[in-house]
Regions:
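Short, small-residue-biased leader/transition segments that mark boundaries at the very start
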Residues: 1-2
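Generic detector of N-terminal low-structure segments
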Residues: 5, 20-23, 32, 44-45
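Compositionally biased, intrinsically disordered low-complexity segments enriched in Pro/Arg/Gln/His
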Residues: 7-9
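Bacterial N-terminal signal peptides that target proteins for export
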Residues: 28-46
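Bacterial N-terminal signal peptides
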Residues: 44-54
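Eukaryotic scaffold repeat domains enriched in small/polar residues
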Residues: 58-393
Length: 393
């Protein structure tokens, strides 16, 4: 055997050399005619090298990843349903398929390195459909643009001024600017829609209006306000777009409007929805901070929570809450009643290991950060069909 790749010289005589290599499920032989001279040996060796280069990149049948069986749709009341779409975990899945010569180059020089999710946490989707994922494990932010087949990684790790240490939650505004909380540096990093760093808000130097551990974030582009939960201060800071504090909401405690380690938050019309992690619930407040109602309590049965994480709202106003410990997503109506839940602890499609962030786009696609499985899983909620206007066509 000449090479482990499968290219072999099987016979040699004074009159001919025969090369054989695998082509899919068949074997192809090449006859190299000529007498046993230095010239024939030269061309024979050249042919061997060429075939070695071409066999992995072109001739051999590409190995296909075993596909997961399609998950059945979850059928809900009133003709609604929830479908599993896909998962993704690396830059490789965004880039277009590489052509023949690129594969040859990859074989000679080695395949390019692709970034993968390490310990993803939070997620947002901008108006262009780009999926933005914070990754404390990689100390940066991944931007997956499947429509344009582009990928970008944002990081300020190791920067002398305003270094990024532990990116947590992410939000986007109406102009697709990106806002990232950093729980260790105590700042909010702002990038423009192209991913260029703009500024940092907040400080750890102390004093009212400075963050200790910023986590959840939401942006109101109309009112020009930024909402940030500070988990250690047990309150929500409301900032203007320059980073000045204009209002604080909440205090430490267990009653309505009080928090015990608040984390994620979302804006919904005039409502402010906050994950109250160590009170094992989600509180719904108005923009002034007045309490409206709460969902959940500690427990291990449907409708209860143990480690509430990401939250989101679909087009019908139903509230989705990730439970990181139980590995499920629970769905509540506006009255706080549990409608259904999906997921389970595991590694298969539709299962989660320590899920964290959640985002629902305007098409009711549900993105769940499956943190310990190092991936994002995508589901699609199909609600009640709205009657068409204007009569029949």
């Amino acid at each position: 055997m000449l090479f482990r790749s499968g290219l072999q010289r099987v016979r040699s005589s004074a009159r001919q050399n025969i090369l054989v290599f695998p082509w899919g499920d068949q074997v192809v032989q090449f006859l190299l005619a000529g007498v046993r001279t230095r010239t024939s040996h030269f061309f024979s060796n050249v042919a061997c090298i060429l075939l070695l280069l071409l066999t992995p990149a072109w001739a051999s049948k590409p190995k296909e990843k075993p596909s997961q069986p399609a998950l059945p749709d979850m059928l809900l009341e009133g003709g609604r349903k929830l479908s599993y779409e896909r998962s993704f975990s690396s830059q490789r899945e965004v880039k277009p398929k590489r052509g023949f010569w690129n594969k040859v180059l990859d074989f000679v020089a080695g395949e390019p390195e692709f970034r993968s999710l390490v310990r993803p946490y939070s997620i947002a989707v901008d108006s262009r459909g780009r999926i933005i994922v914070t990754d404390p494990g990689a100390i940066g932010v991944h931007i997956f643009d499947f429509q344009q087949q582009k990928y970008k990684f944002l990081s300020r790790a190791g920067k002398g001024k305003d270094p990024m240490l532990a990116p947590q939650c992410v939000a986007v505004d109406a102009q697709d600017n990106i806002y990232v909380t950093d729980s260790e540096s105590g700042k909010v990093f702002v990038f423009n829609s192209d991913g260029k760093y703009q500024r940092a808000l907040g400080s750890l130097k102390g004093g009212e209006g400075f963050f200790k551990r910023p986590t959840g974030i939401a942006v109101d582009s109309v009112a020009q306000r930024i909402y940030v939960t500070d988990t250690l201060r047990n309150k929500i800071f409301v900032l203007d777009m320059q980073g000045s504090v204009v209002q604080t909401i909440g205090e430490n405690g267990e009653g309505p409007g009080k928090f015990n380690f608040p984390t994620e938050l979302r804006l919904d019309g005039q409502n402010l929805i906050v994950v109250d992690a160590m009170n094992f619930s989600v509180q719904v407040l108005d923009r002034s901070g007045a309490f409206k109602y709460a969902v959940g309590k500690i427990g291990d049965s449907p409708g209860t929570m143990f480690r509430p994480k990401g939250i989101g709202l679909d087009s019908e106003g139903d509230l989705y809450v990730v439970d990181g410990l139980w590995g499920v997503v629970q769905v509540f109506n506006r009255d706080g009643d549990l409608l259904y839940y999906f997921g389970n602890r595991g590694t298969s499609a539709g299962e989660f290991q320590l899920p964290a962030g959640l985002f629902i786009d305007h098409n009711d696609r549900i993105f769940v950060v499956d943190s310990f499985n190092r991936r994002v899983q995508v589901f699609h909620y199909y609600g009640v069909a709205k009657p068409s206007k204007g009569g029949s066509q």
